[in-house]
Each structure stands twice: as structure tokens, then as C-alpha cells.
Amino acid sequence: PYAGPVVFLLLGGFLLALGIERWDLHRRIALTVVSLVGVRADRLLLGFMIATAFLSMWISNSATAMLMVPIGIAVIVSVGAVDEHDRKSTERDEEDDLLVGVRGEPVERPATGFGLALMLGIAYSASIGGVATLIGSPPNAVFAGVAESRLDVQISFLDWLVFAGPLSIVFLFVAWLLLVKLLRPEIPIEQGAEDVIRTQREELGGISRGERRMLAVFTLVAAGWLLRPFVLQPLFPAITDTVVAIVGGVLLFVVPVDYEAREFLLDWSDATRLPWGVLLLLGAGFSLANAFRESGLDTVIAESFAGVAGAPLVVLVLVIAIVVVFLTEVTSNTATATVFMPIMISLGITLGESPLMLMATAALAASMAFMLPVATPPNAVVFGSGYVTIPQMSRIGLWLNLLGIIATIVLTYLWLPIAFATAG
């Protein structure tokens, strides 16, 4: 299980993310997207959320939040989107504000509508964007790995994107509308926001050779994942999404940026920052799923749900979504998905329902935790900025949790049979 295809798929994805981070390509993408939407409060919020969600599709949710929070804080400080009565006690230079966001040191600094909306928007869109791809969030990879090992159903990168991509896009705009309606963000000084974004883009300078080559490798890998079923697989059936990911990861170590200086897109000093813990947790999860099966524990647990045998499938999906969403508020989403996947398989078989549908419900619901700082790393990073309090996050997050449950049910019940029609 520790050397399964999904583990290596995630390994390749992590290497790609490290390369993107090393050459600051993610920062350039984020600032470009934000600058395109304009500086009106609602548009600026949408720009930040789109940029965050897109990056979160390819690099970890926590790394995305760590990138976007300092940029967001710089904008908030520049436009004066902090309560007037908090100014005297919170005056500090811009560098200190950025460090607070990066270090995650909570401070007493409530923000008005725009500051609060921007911080929450970054946290929520980091989680929402991660839903869209197999490498975006560990529960997605857990789902694919268990489906392949237990059901012999192969979920490709494109399969998952077709399935979860629409949810990610629609739910991103739902979250944006909710923040706009509930918080009514306004920018006191629009020019300040424009100046900050322009200054940060100027600091990046022109696109470097490393960025260009990193973008080329990233585009090649993404195209390989998306076009593999149509272009690569008919010619080379042995090529899987995992092969594409590993080839892309290897390319990062051999594509030179400055050959004479022996500088490449990635070196081992960068690779030591790989999140090995996540890969080990994933392998442990697959081992746990096998242990559930071999011991018969999954069947015992599934049979304990015999009381819901006569309930409609939509009710069963609703119950699973509610339980997983609120459980994930206080536990790791990866751990939650790992425990639930084998149970969902046995439950589906016991009740005569589609195990894949129940598993997908649990996988999606595990990423729909928006209420508490401990629920997800992006929530914790944003809370650490000091611009968001727990009651504020809980109040907005509860609405998103409920909407996330509804969206999960609709997607799995209506769209999954169509999206996964060719999977396997």
C-alpha cells in the first residue's frame, strides 16, 4: 500500500508543487489573476478566491493559503480595512503584518467587512479548489486508491476532474456570493489595493528562465493528465496518471536553468521539503482499509446500519455527508476519509447500493469543513493572521457547511453516474 500508484501520483504532484514554489510561479499566477479583476471590493475578493482555488488544484491547500495570506494582509493594511478603534493598538509596519500572517501568531485585530471577507475567502477557496483534482486534496487520492484496490475501478485524473470540477467552480462562486451578501465588503481606499498589487508584480520583475521552463513542464504534465485517455493511452496503454506524474517529477531534476552553473528546476535540497508525512499517512490509510477488509470489521460496521436498509439512497447520502462534514471539523480530513472509505464499500454492498457513490460522498464531504480553525490548515493559517475570530469563522462557515452538504448530495446523486460512466 505504501508504494501504490496513488501514493506515487501524489509524490509526483508534490514535486511539481515544489518546483512551482521554488520559482515563485504560483505568486506570479496569483498576482496576475488578482490584477485582472479590478480593485472594486467584490471583484478583488473574487480575484483572490479564483487565484487561490486555481493554485490549490495543483499545490497543497496549506501552501496556497500561506502564499495568499501575506498578499491579502498587505492589501488590507494598504486600504485601511481595519476597524478605526483598532488602529492605535495595532499600528505596525507592513513587514510586521506580513510576518503575522506567515507565522500564524493570533493577534487581537478584528477587521471590517472587506478584511474579514478576504481572509475567509482565501481559506475557503483553498479548500474548495483542492476538491477539483486528485492531487488537490488527500481525501480525493484516498478515494481513488481504495476504489482501485477494493473495487478494481481506476479513477483517472480526468475522471475526477470531470466529476468534481463542476462542483469546485460552482461552489467557489457560491462562497463568494455568500461572503459578499453577509459581510458586504467595501474598500475605503481602492487606489491602495491597486498600488500594493502593482508593487508586488513589479518586485517579481520579468519572467525568468526558470519560471518559463517550470511553466513548460507544468503545462506538459497537466496536458498529459487531461489528454492521456484520448492521446497517450491508445498508443501506450501502460501509461497511467502515475507515470505522467513521475515523469514530470524526474524532468524537474534534469531540465537545466543554467547548465554551466549546474542549476536545475529542482534539486535534492528542495526535495527534502516533500511532505513525507502525508505520503506515509496515505499508505497507512490504504493499509488500514485492507485491515478492515481482512478482519471483517468493515462488514460488522456496515451491518450495524441495517436499520437504514429501507431508506432511499438520497437519505443515506445525506446522512453520510452530514456525519463526515461535521466530523471533519474536529479531525483530519485525510484520517476521516481513510476510516470511512472501507466502511462505505461494505455499507454499499450490504444495502445493495453503489459503493462508489457512498465513497465519493465521504471524500467530497471531508473537504467541506469551514467552521473551525482546526478543521483545515487554510482555516488555521487565516485564523493565525489575527483578522478572523472563531465566532466569525463559525458563523459564515456554518452556512458553507450546510451548502456544501447540499452540493455534495446533488453532485454524487445526479452527476456521479454520468461522470464515472467510463471509469474502470
Model-derived regions: residue spans:
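C-terminal transmembrane helix pair
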Residues: 96-101, 123, 165, 280-288, ...
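Re-entrant/interfacial helical elements at transmembrane boundaries that shape
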Residues: 62-77, 119-123, 132-149, 192, ...
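Membrane-embedded alpha-helical segments and adjacent helix-loop junctions characteristic
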Residues: 1-88, 93, 101-109, 277-351
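A cytosolic-side transmembrane-helix exit/cap motif
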Residues: 1-4, 28, 83-96, 260-268, ...
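Membrane-interface segments at loop-to-transmembrane junctions
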Residues: 34-39, 105-111, 196-208, 267-276, ...
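Residues that define the loop-to-transmembrane-helix transition and helix capping
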Residues: 42-43, 116, 158, 242, ...
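Membrane-core helix-loop-helix motifs of multi-pass transport proteins
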Residues: 86, 93-185, 381-412
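Hydrophobic transmembrane alpha-helices of multi-pass small-molecule transporters
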Residues: 1-11, 17-18, 149-155, 159-303, ...
